[in-house]
C-alpha cells in the first residue's frame, strides 16, 4: 500500500498534468494572430501515412497575421493544402506553387464568443479530470486508513492536503482559461 505522502505526490502530479493538457488544448484555439501551434492538429497524407504538418514543412510567421508554410518536398504541397481545408480551422490556404500562405482573419465578436465557450468547455473537462484525481486519492486514503496504514489524525491531515491541492489545481486551470479568454476578447 502506498504511503500518504506517495498518494499526495501522485495526486499533485496528475493534477499538474491536467493543467499542461489544458494549455496544449487552448493553444490550438486561435486568437486572431498568427501562431504556428494553430497547425498542430493538421495531419498531411505523406507516403500513405498521416504525418504532422511540422514534419513535412517549415512554418514561419512573416507578418503578425500570416503563416508561411514551405514544404521540404514540393510534391506534398497539394496534400498540405487539402489537409488545411480538411482541418476545419476556418483558414483558406493560398498556394503560390512553392509555398502556402495562410492569412489569419480578424475575429468577429460572435466568433470570439464562440471561442470563449470552447475555452469554458475545455476548462470544465480539465476540472472534471482534477476532481477525478481527488476522488481516487481520497479513496486510496480511506483504504489506507481502514487498513491501519495511518491513524485518524494523519488521515484527516492528508485529506485536507489533497483538498488543498485540488483547490490549487482548479485555481491554476481557471487562471489558464481566464488568460486565454482575455487574449481572445482583446484579439
UniProtKB/Swiss-Prot annotation:
Function: Responsible for the release of ribosomes from messenger RNA at the termination of protein biosynthesis. May increase the efficiency of translation by recycling ribosomes from one round of translation to another.
InterPro entries associated with the record: Ribosome_recyc_fac, Ribosome_recyc_fac_dom, RRF_sf
Region (Disordered): 141-169
The keyword Repeat is assigned to this record: no
Keyword check for Cell wall biogenesis/degradation: no
CDD domains: RRF
Signal peptide range in chain numbering: none
Coiled coil: none
HAMAP family (UniProt xref): RRF (MF_00040)
Keyword annotations from UniProtKB, A to Z: Cytoplasm, Protein biosynthesis
BP terms from Gene Ontology: translational termination
Upper taxonomic lineage: Bacteria, Bacillati, Bacillota, Bacilli, Lactobacillales
Pfam families tied to this protein: RRF
Gene name of this polypeptide: frr
Protein source organism: Limosilactobacillus reuteri (strain DSM 20016)
Protein name (database record): Ribosome-recycling factor
UniProt GO cellular component terms: cytoplasm
GO-annotated molecular function: ribosomal large subunit binding
Bilayer-spanning residue ranges: none
PANTHER family: MITOCHONDRIAL RIBOSOME RECYCLING FACTOR PSEUDO 1, RIBOSOME RECYCLING FACTOR
UniProt subcellular location: Cytoplasm
Family: Belongs to the RRF family.
Amino acid at each position: 500500500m502506498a504511503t500518504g505522502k506517495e498518494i499526495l505526490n501522485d495526486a499533485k502530479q496528475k493534477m499538474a498534468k491536467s493543467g499542461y493538457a489544458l494549455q496544449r488544448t487552448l493553444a490550438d484555439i486561435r486568437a486572431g494572430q498568427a501562431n504556428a501551434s494553430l497547425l498542430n492538429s493538421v495531419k498531411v497524407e505523406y507516403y500513405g501515412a498521416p504525418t504532422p504538418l511540422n514534419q513535412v514543412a517549415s512554418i514561419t510567421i512573416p507578418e503578425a497575421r500570416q503563416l508561411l508554410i514551405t514544404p521540404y518536398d514540393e510534391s506534398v504541397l497539394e496534400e498540405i493544402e487539402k489537409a488545411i481545408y480538411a482541418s476545419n480551422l476556418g483558414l483558406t490556404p493560398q498556394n503560390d506553387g512553392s509555398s502556402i500562405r495562410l492569412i489569419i482573419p480578424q475575429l468577429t465578436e460572435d466568433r470570439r464568443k464562440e471561442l470563449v465557450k470552447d475555452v469554458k468547455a475545455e476548462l470544465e473537462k480539465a476540472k472534471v479530470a482534477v476532481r477525478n484525481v481527488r476522488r481516487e486519492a481520497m479513496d486510496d486514503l480511506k483504504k489506507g486508513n481502514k487498513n491501519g496504514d495511518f491513524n485518524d489524525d494523519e488521515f484527516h491531515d492528508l485529506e485536507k492536503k489533497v483538498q488543498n491541492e485540488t483547490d490549487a489545481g482548479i485555481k491554476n486551470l481557471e487562471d489558464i482559461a481566464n488568460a486565454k479568454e482575455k487574449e481572445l476578447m482583446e484579439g
